């Protein structure tokens, strides 16, 4: 009987454990019973308020700090020195494209041996090479033609001096020489303007540019810093006064006690 009673108790215990285990599993499996642990607080995702460069959208550091070169505000207020230098070199402009403020900068040319090639596409390089080749050939032909015409004209002048008469072919050649010379000068002037612009671009690309901060933005920064520092100083003074009051009260209490003891 005793053994049967023990067997019955063991069966009841096993049934109770299985029931409780199944209930725990069902609770764990149900989505409504899951609750977030209290030790892991929920964090809200907020946009970063860090200052970033308006060209590369990166933050500033000790090696490449952010500067404020113009009057733009908001997300366009800051820019890296290197990013702005590269933009000025490629665009060949000296003012902001938005607020039109002319940058305050110091320029210095690199040594000639350290000059870099102008960044151009393959089609632009091909056009420049073809243009230079055509211009060299055209200038050679014009110079040779003028030389031949001038030489023959000089011979006719000598013959005319001997005969005392200058024929029509001489005047025709003289007009052709004058027109050719004038056209050659105009052609050289137009092409020289193109090459001068190209030379300016190359010089601008090989300049070392240091852009300074806008004076007004610097004043604003100094004013903001002073406004932030002044309340801190006032709070420190208030804390110092409060601390001195507590210390004085702390030291005056024993004096009162001593006086009371003397009276006794």
UniProtKB/Swiss-Prot annotation:
E3 ubiquitin-protein ligase that mediates ubiquitination of cd86 and MHC class II proteins, such as hla-dr alpha and beta, and promotes their subsequent endocytosis and sorting to lysosomes via multivesicular bodies. One of its GO terms (cellular component) is early endosome membrane. Keywords: Cytoplasmic vesicle, Endosome, Immunity, Lysosome, Membrane, Metal-binding, Transferase, Transmembrane, Transmembrane helix, Ubl conjugation pathway, Zinc, Zinc-finger. Residues 16-47 have a biased composition (Polar residues). Signal peptide: none annotated. The keyword Ribonucleoprotein does not apply. A zinc finger (RING-CH-type) spans 45-106. It is an enzyme of class 2 (transferase). Its EC number is 2.3.2.27. The chain crosses the membrane at residues 130-150, 170-190. Zn(2+) 2 binds at residues 70, 72, 96, 99. Residues 15-47 are annotated as: Disordered. It is a multi-pass membrane protein. This is E3 ubiquitin-protein ligase MARCHF8. InterPro entries: Znf_RING, Znf_RING-CH, Znf_RING/FYVE/PHD. Gene3D superfamilies: Zinc/RING finger domain, C3HC4 (zinc finger). Zn(2+) 1 binds at residues 53, 56, 80, 83. It catalyses: S-ubiquitinyl-[E2 ubiquitin-conjugating enzyme]-L-cysteine + [acceptor protein]-L-lysine = [E2 ubiquitin-conjugating enzyme]-L-cysteine + N(6)-ubiquitinyl-[acceptor protein]-L-lysine. It comes from Xenopus laevis. GO terms for biological process: antigen processing and presentation of peptide antigen via MHC class II; immune response; protein polyubiquitination. Pathway: Protein modification; protein ubiquitination. PROSITE patterns: ZF_RING_CH. It holds the Pfam family RINGv. The RING-CH-type zinc finger domain is required for E3 ligase activity. GO terms for molecular function: MHC protein binding; ubiquitin protein ligase activity; ubiquitin-protein transferase activity; zinc ion binding.
